[in-house]
Amino acid sequence: MIPKIIHYCWLSNDPVPDVFDKYIKGWHEKLPDYEFIKWDFSKFDINESEWVREAFQNKKYAFACDYIRLYAVYSYGGIYMDMDIEVIKSFNTLIDKPYMFAYEGKKNQGIEAGCFGTDKNNEFIGKCLDYYKGRTFIKNDGSFDMRPLPQIMQEIYNKNGYNYQIYSHEYFTAKSFNSGIVNITPNTYTVHHFAGSWKSDAEKDRIKRLQYLSKKYGWFGKNYAELKSAHEDYGIDGIIELLKSKIERKVVRRK
């Protein structure tokens, strides 16, 4: 059984944004019988992990929290939530199992790392923690290792052949990263609003533009925005790679 503990992380010295405060108040309203643990400087020694220390020193707090969320859930059990998570209803109908995971996207690609839970010392979460052992956030070429945690978790899950029941996108995400459209169903427990604090301002602007075009022009707008972003980043090579990836995904789905 998953303990009734909610873990969340805030490492910045900046004030917590009002919108996050609003979500956290909602957590307490919807989950009155849960314990809440805030992970900050007083709770976690950033020098315990080279990854966390380097990410923190470079103000990439979301990546420092990638390790801390795994550490918190592994050490205590419970549920981790990003601060941009809106709780729709209590988890009480899910926590009788030893874990709760859902996919981040509708195509069952990437495990949602913004909301997940397990009992204490969960093997899968332990292996995710092992991924960071001896790993540095600053790569040999001086760039940052900004690989998203959902991809890391999915890779480790697949590599080890786990057979967990993983819920669909509608359970803990319920929002399109590309379009920004929220789709709450009877199965929805939380909505992940994708604040994307780790993204640059330019990346955030591109996401907003893509979401606007998707909402206004649907499929055409979404694909136009993706092509435009690929061209801005990598020129004609970016467009070619984007089209190749779309074709490959269609081939895989047809098999």
Which residues does each predicted region cover?
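Small-residue hinge/turn detector
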Residues: 67-78
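Glycosyltransferase-associated regions of secretory-pathway enzymes
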Residues: 1-65, 83-255
